[in-house]
Amino acid sequence: MSTSIPDVAVHDSPAIAAPLRWVGMDGIVVPVQLTIADGGQHVIGRARAQIDLPAMEVKGIHMSRLYRLLDTHAVEPLTPVGICGLLSAMVNSHADCASTAARVDWYFDWLRRVPALVSNDLSGWRGYPVWLRAEYSAGHVQFWLCVEVGYSSTCPCSAALARQMLADAFLQEHVEVSALSPETVADWLRSNGSYATPHSQRSLARIEVALTEQAVELGLPALVDCAERILSTPVQAAVRRVDEQAFARLNGANLMYVEDATRRLQHGLAIHYSAFRVHVRHLESLHPHDAVASTADE
């Protein structure tokens, strides 16, 4: 009985000799350590790890090598500085495949405790989907950090139509009245103010920004704060009625088409980030389809 274990990837030749741009694994379960200014955080994520395979005569890469490198790196905080070492090690581990490029993607939810809009003693958890890509090629590393921010959008056209209907209803009911006290008008509005209401919906902004190789942290809080400040209507966690009322006021003061939200983000992000991409989606309540828009400054 033979004691040697066959290694097909090493000893066999491919049926078709051709280089491959990327080869690796996807959906790898990994722990993710985040370095955040207000304290570290450990979350569960998934990763994709790949290298190029330019050697046409090599049947397959050594995926276990990539897995072990990723596993070893998982004990460290996820930072651009540390990731550079991981990518270099991935390429070096496949010198026998003539590999020159590597990339890793991480997917996870960043958890953040957020205060209520008005209630000082109330807060709750928000989860932000995050995607981080790092790619090494030709001696250069590129980093893209992507986060998805949820917010509320109220249609400007629908709001105008609702206001018109409310005004028409008021005039029709008081056509023969020459003067009304403020209290009477206020009472009428309390009873009839929702005669027609504009449609609004939960909306999503996916924001990608470029990071530098020298960055010692991802900068998630700064990016999320920037986006939510620009949009002004981020979805809430725990609320009381007073917070819900404040949220309604914010929505009324920030009527947005999908184009408006995208342009807001484009203008606001350009002040803080040299390269970014924005993808916005309004999950329409009027239509069975979504409204979408995107822009980039690279």
Swiss-Prot record:
InterPro entries: GTP_cyclohydrolase_FolE2, GTP_cyclohydrolase_FolE2/MptA. The keyword Hydrolase applies. Its EC number is 3.5.4.16. GO terms for biological process: tetrahydrofolate biosynthetic process. It holds the Pfam family GCHY-1. Pathway: Cofactor biosynthesis; 7,8-dihydroneopterin triphosphate biosynthesis; 7,8-dihydroneopterin triphosphate from GTP: step 1/1. Keywords: Hydrolase. Converts GTP to 7,8-dihydroneopterin triphosphate. NCBIfam families: PRK13674.1-1 (NF010200). HAMAP family: GTP_cyclohydrol_B. Belongs to the GTP cyclohydrolase IV family. This is GTP cyclohydrolase FolE2. It comes from Xylella fastidiosa (strain M12).
